[in-house]
Swiss-Prot record:
Encoding gene per record: yigA
Database matches in Pfam families: DUF484
NCBIfam families the UniProt entry points to: PRK10963.1 (NF008203)
Domain of life assignment: Bacteria
Protein name listed in UniProt: Uncharacterized protein YigA
PANTHER family: DUF484 DOMAIN-CONTAINING PROTEIN (PTHR38765:SF1)
InterPro entries to which the protein is assigned, alphabetical: DUF484, GAF-like_dom_sf
Organism of derivation: Salmonella typhimurium (strain LT2 / SGSC1412 / ATCC 700720)
Source species taxonomy: Bacteria, Pseudomonadati, Pseudomonadota, Gammaproteobacteria, Enterobacterales
S-S bridge residues: none
Amino acid sequence: MKQPEEELQETLTELDDRAVVDYLRHHPEFFIRNAHAVEAMRVPHPVRGTVSLVEWHMARARNHINVLEENMTLLMEQAHANESLFYRLLHLQSRLVAADSLDEMLVRFHRWARDLGLAGATLRLFPDRWRLGAPSRYTHLALNRQAFEPLRIQRLGQSQHYLGPLNGPELLVVLPEAKAVGSVAMSMMGSDGGLGVILFSSRDPHHYQPGQGTQLLQEIALMLPELLERWIKRV
């Protein structure tokens, strides 16, 4: 517990600091009148012991400039990434819209992924949200929700996306015909994530890793349902 004398001293110190700051704020000419004294003032420094007030101020200014430059660089990198994302998505959309059938659209989707250096791209649809039964020719796209649920809980949790490896049993659920899959980018399709699953696969086990950006995946997951409805009706 602090003694009354200590509390009084802290109060006086606080008042003195405030008084000094207020005085300097209202009397900026102080620095002109006392230029030599200001130049001789020393400020504690963690490495050099002390530095002059002028050096201290210049160091703060340099740090501020460095922060501004870093922020500007980050903004420019983000703008470049957004531009790249926009054109990549536009390229995909223009390809898929030009398809004359669902089969052709799926081939175009797969080729787009291959052009990016991936093993391929796959769509799987939940049959309780799409009419995939006979006489539909697209029953092979159906993904049993109950069979998928353990994988979803294990890999996605509360997220809409998963990036990383899948084990053998998991691959049999979502990519039963795929071979040499090292890692995947998996996204739940639709605004509520309940329409199906989009999978991009790579033979490289380190290509997709947790923590990578998912903005492109999100945009594709929102774009595809409307295109699919040209050939498959929703339940």
